[in-house]
From Swiss-Prot:
SUPFAM superfamilies associated with the record: Carbohydrate phosphatase (SSF56655)
Keyword set includes Metal-binding: yes
Keyword Hydrolase: yes
GO biological process: inositol metabolic process; phosphatidylinositol phosphate biosynthetic process; signal transduction
Pfam families given in the database record: Inositol_P
Enzyme superclass (EC): hydrolase
Name under which the protein is recorded: Inositol-1-monophosphatase
EC number(s) on file: 3.1.3.25
Catalytic activity: a myo-inositol phosphate + H2O = myo-inositol + phosphate
Gene this protein is translated from: suhB
């Protein structure tokens, strides 16, 4: 997804791509909604708990048809189909046809369609649609962020102890000690609460529109976060690596906040190992 030659595009191009992504998420969202409660095929994709249904596949097929027809020269990175097109193409669509598949498979209505356009690996256009709440989030670099065509902004919460956060847990959480459990425990102590939706894209848009103040997670893929990153940034938030350095999509780690608690949340994540060691020792003495 890299290129030595800098791609050339205009604000009107961004608007066009935004409309293409919107067309695709709405069409896929309608398909997902029509299959609600009717899923018959649920499979695991090689990792325990990593599910795929016919809704994922059918929604992705709809999106791919639209993107390929409207942007035939662009590459695609889709959750179910993988990499399509040349790896070094500077324009690459990152597609999650159904983010929150496990929720969907259990008839828990917290899922969405997420489509982001990466330009030289930088999330530049993002659209997320939640068909169960009929919420359409859109953003493009320098064009702002909207919810159902109305501008949105991140929250104004200025301290971690007043914040409401959200996180998630990777599919390999049972097999690794780097599973986000200590961070979840520590941040629960430091904040007004930590939620878990089961959809990275929904977590990001909830930060973007001010429902939540911050989000962190490990073990996620570019298609999980590409669209949401643009939306958070255009809503006035900050997205980075855990240590506040520039985000690298390939690491699978992301920190996104309203900006006001960003440094404090980053410091808390860094302090987690020491806190958890002390907490575990103290708990062992009491049991």
């Amino acid at each position: 997804m890299t290129s030595a030659q800098k791609p050339v595009f205009s604000p009107s191009d961004l608007q066009t791509w935004l409309e293409i992504a919107t067309e695709a998420v709405l069409a896929a969202g309608a398909e997902i909604f029509s299959l609600w409660g009717k899923v018959q095929q649920i499979q695991e994709k090689g990792r325990a708990g990593d599910l795929v249904t016919e809704a994922d596949r059918q929604a992705e097929a709809i999106i791919l048809e639209i993107i390929k027809r409207r942007c035939p020269d662009h590459a695609i990175l889709a959750e179910e189909s993988g990499q399509l097109g040349q790896v070094d193409n500077p324009f690459c669509w990152a597609i999650d046809p159904l983010d929150g598949t496990t929720n969907f498979a259990h008839s828990y209505p917290v899922s969405c369609v997420s489509i982001g356009l990466l330009i030289q690996d930088i999330p530049t256009v993002g659209v997320v649609y939640n068909p169960f709440r009929q919420e359409l989030f859109r953003a493009a670099t320098s064009l702002g962020a909207t919810l159902n065509r109305r501008p949105i902004q991140v929250s104004t919460t200025a301290s971690l102890d007043k914040s409401l956060l959200v996180t998630g847990f990777a599919y390999d959480r049972v097999k690794t000690l780097d599973n986000n459990y200590p961070e979840f425990c520590y941040l629960t102590h430091l904040t007004q609460g930590v939620r878990r939706s089961g959809s990275a894209a929904i977590d990001l848009i909830d930060v973007a529109c001010g429902r939540l103040d911050g989000y962190w997670e490990r073990g996620i893929n570019p298609w999980d976060m590409a669209a949401g990153i643009v939306i958070v940034r255009e809503a006035g938030g900050i997205v980075s690596a855990y240590d506040c350095s520039p985000l690298d999509l390939s690491t699978g780690r992301i920190l996104a906040t309203n900006g006001k608690i960003h440094q404090e949340l980053s410091q808390a994540l860094a302090a987690t190992p020491q806190w958890f060691q002390q907490y575990a020792a103290a708990r062992a003495q009491k049991i």
